[in-house]
Amino acid sequence: MYKNRVELTTTAPVNRALPNAPDGYTPQGETCPSKRPSIRNATALSSAETSWLKARRNNTKDALKAFLSRVDLGSFNGSDYIANHSANASALPNIGIAVSGGGYRALMNGGGALQAFDNRTTNSTHSGQLGGILQSATYLSGLSGGSWLVGSIYMNNFSDVSSLQDNGSVWQFQDSIFSGPTQSTTWDIGTVEYYSQLLGAVDGKSNAGYEVSITDYWGRSLSYQLINASEGGVGYTWSSIALSKDFQAGTMPMPLVIADGRAPGEILVPANTTVFEFNPWEFGSWDKSLSAFVSLEFLGSNFSKGTLATGEKCVRGFDNAGFIMGTSSSLFNQAFLQMNNTDAPSVVKDAISAILGKIGSENNDIAVYKPNPFYRYASQSKYTSSPSLTLVDGGEDLQNIPLDPLLQPQRHVDVILAVDSSADTTTRWPNGTSLVATYERNVDSSQRNSSLPFPSVPDQNTFVNLGLNNRPTFFGCNSSNATGAPLVVYIPNAPYIYPSNVSTFDLQYNTSERNAIIENGYDVATLGNGTVDSNWPACLACAILSRSFERTNTTVPKTCSTCFKTYCWNGTINATTPGDYYPTLKLH
C-alpha cells in the first residue's frame, strides 16, 4: 500500500542556498503540488539522488585527473587511467569525505582538512598538495560540529574554507553565542537586538502551533556565526540546496548531516541507535527500525500512514538550516543552561526555563520534530507510534564520524576519508572510538539495527599503542576480508604546529587561535605538507584508486603496494592499557 518512490517537486534553479522559507523561521502551510508528497520506503536511492549522481560522477573526472597528474605513482599514470575509463563512470573511484563531531574543534580541524582537499585554496595544487580531492568527491557528510562546517559551506554558496575564514562576516568565534555577532563586519548588532531576534524567531514557530525545544534557540544562535545573511539566515532552508543551479549541475559533492533518534529517557547504544539522515532532498533513516524517507521540503506537514489526508496543507520552512545543524549538535543545548549566568534578558531565560519545566532536564538535548512525518507509517516502531519524533546529537551513540550514510550499499562508495576530531582520551585526542562503535554496530553485534559492510578495526588501546590515532591509517585494504566495504582512510586530529585538542565545550576562540587550529588541520590532512612523509599524496591517491583497480582488473602499481605496507593496518593487536596520551608537536 506504500509507494517505494516519491517524485520530488522541481523548481526553477537558483544560484545558491537561499532564504526560501515562506515566513522566516515560522513554518507555513501552503497548497500542495499536484502530486502530493508521501513517505517512501528506503529500498533504494531517491529518484532525485539517482538523477543527480549521473551529473556528479561525470563532473568528478577532471578534478581527479588533475590531482593524480601531480602525484608520483612511478611508471603508473593515474591521470591516463581516469581518462581511459572515463566512458564508464561506475568504474572510477567514488569518494566520500566524513567530518566528525567535536564542537568548534571539529569545525576548525575539519575545516583545515577540507581546505587541504580544495583546489580553490591557494597553493593547494602545488606538488605534494591534496587540492582537488574535494572536487573529486561524491559525498560530504558532517555530524555535530562537523555539520556546522558542512552547513556553513553550503549555506554560503559552497564557499571555500579560506573565504569563510577571511570573510569577516562569519566564523567570528571570538563572539560568544551569548553576546551575538558583535564583531561581524557585516551583521554586527547589539546583544539586546540579538536576543530580540532569537526570541522573535522561535516565538513565531511556537505561536504557529509547533512545539519548540532548546534546540530551536541553539540552532538560531549558531546560525549567526555560520550563515552570511541578516538575522543568521533566518529563512534559509536545507532543502534549498537542491534548488541551487550549481548543485543541480553536479558541480559539488552532496552534503549529508546526521542525527540520532532517541525517545525521551532512552539510553543510546550503537547497536540499537536509529541514525537519521538529512540530505538536500529528503529526511529519514535507512535503518531497519524505520527504513523510510520524507521530502525534506515538506517536513512539518501532517503525514499519517505515509500520506497527507485530503485537506491537509503542505508545510514549508520547517527544515531551517540552523535547526538542522542544531539538531545534529543538540548536545550543546546544555550551553543554554548557562544562560542564567549571563546578561540575557529575563524573557529569554524564562522561555528556556519553561521548556525545561515541560520536558525535564534529563531531556534537554532533544530536538522535537512534531508532527512526526512517520507517524503510523508501515510497521509499528517507537518512531512511528508517537505524533512527535525526537532527535539528538549525531555523536551520542559514540559514532562520532558520520560514516553511516556513506556505507549504504546503494551509494557504492569506494573510499571514505574520515577526519576524526573526537576528544576520546583524557587529553582530548582521538583513539578510534568512533570506528570501533561503527564496527560493533554493523559487524560485531547480536542486536543489530544495521548490518552495513565495514572493515575490521582494532580496539581503542591498540589505536593508541600502535600510534594509529596519531597518523593516517587505512582500514579495509584487503577487500576480500571485507566484502562490499569501502576502504576507510582514518585521519585523526594530531598536533603538528598547534595543540588543537581544545575542549569540546569551549565556545569562544580568538582569531589567532582559530587560524592556528585550521592551519593545524591542514597539516593533519597533508602530513605537514608532506614534511612527515613526502610519499603521502601518492599513498592517499592509491587508497582512492584501490577499489577502482579491482573493478577494472588493473594490477596494483608498485608504488601503491609500498604505500599499503606503510599505511594499511596489518591486523596487529596490542590491547594493553596505555598510559596517558600526551603527543608532542610534529613540526617545530
UniProtKB/Swiss-Prot annotation:
The gene is plb2. PANTHER family: CYTOSOLIC PHOSPHOLIPASE A2, LYSOPHOSPHOLIPASE. Belongs to the lysophospholipase family. It is an enzyme of class 3 (hydrolase). Keywords: Glycoprotein, Hydrolase, Lipid degradation, Lipid metabolism. InterPro entries: Acyl_Trfase/lysoPLipase, LysoPLipase_cat_dom. This is Lysophospholipase 2. Its EC number is 3.1.1.5.
